[in-house]
């Protein structure tokens, strides 16, 4: 136990919080270029072919990003925007692709939850 005198000289230091999304470097989103677009299978007990892409970010990081929604137009060399947010059943996938930004199109024929999938309001 430290004495009062020791604490006056050198106060207790706070533990630095570890980021869940280190590649973003405290930014809300980052731009990057797809280096590989592929599908992968989730952990047990789930079963699917999840669409993901490997992205080289502007800050030099190379991360894996999940592509949400039904269908996408991404391929190698597509420029995309990524945001934080992990996919619980895909180990190592800690980022999401922002739909409707840069080269990534919005989800076709989407009527509900449109803002999450980059879809404009349909003409009434």
Curated annotation (Swiss-Prot):
List the GO cellular component terms: small ribosomal subunit
Identify the stretch annotated as signal peptide in this record.
Answer: none
Keywords attached to this Swiss-Prot or TrEMBL record, sorted alphabetically, are: Methylation, Ribonucleoprotein, Ribosomal protein, RNA-binding, rRNA-binding, tRNA-binding
> Per its UniProt record, what CDD domains does this chain match?
Ribosomal_S12 (cd03368)
Gene3D superfamilies in the record, alphabetically?
A: Nucleic acid-binding proteins (2.40.50.140)
Q: Name one GO biological process term.
A: translation
UniProt KW Cell membrane keyword: no
Q: Which residues are annotated with the PTM 3-methylthioaspartic acid?
A: 89
An example molecular function term from Gene Ontology annotations: structural constituent of ribosome
Quaternary structure? Part of the 30S ribosomal subunit. Contacts proteins S8 and S17. May interact with IF1 in the 30S initiation complex.
Relate the protein's function as given in its record. Answer: With S4 and S5 plays an important role in translational accuracy.
Give the family per the record. Answer: Belongs to the universal ribosomal protein uS12 family.
Mind telling me what this protein is named? Answer: Small ribosomal subunit protein uS12
For this protein's source organism, the top of the classification is: Bacteria, Pseudomonadati, Pseudomonadota, Gammaproteobacteria, Enterobacterales
